[in-house]
């Protein structure tokens, strides 16, 4: 993990922690608090083109198939791209009610692109894909 900018690293970790706390609470509004207005999200079969589209999609999910779920995220690295941009890579998964662990086939690798705007770190883009493990 890049630790040469401890204040920025702490702020980015805070963005990700807040994001997952909102997930665990099933709160779509809080989920997108740290997303840029023009943020994009790409996941298998999904392409969201704004913070509002992300919020709507999560609200629908939290009201149905994601209800009561929790998310885990194991942050791997943060790499800075100049003063106001960073890429974070993590391994994440969704734990559904009654599960104690996320099954390996539901784990994903996630890429977070963050931009510092007006002194605050915001999610500019998010992408995940299945974490395929060699047999």
Predicted regions and their residues:
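Basic/polar N-terminal segments that are highly enriched at the extreme N-terminus
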Residues: 1-10, 134-135
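A solvent-exposed, acidic/Ser-Thr-rich amphipathic alpha-helical stretch
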Residues: 6-15, 28-84, 90-91, 103-106
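Short helix-adjacent coil turns
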Residues: 19, 26-27
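Short, surface-exposed beta-strand-loop junctions and turns on beta-sheet-rich folds
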Residues: 49, 94-95, 129
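Flexible loop/coil segments at beta-strand boundaries within sensory signal-transduction domains
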Residues: 81, 97-99, 116-120
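Generic short beta-strand segments
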Residues: 89-97
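A short, polar/proline- and glycine-enriched secondary-structure boundary/capping micro-motif
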Residues: 98-101, 133-135
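Short beta-strand edge/turn micro-motifs at domain boundaries
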Residues: 107-134
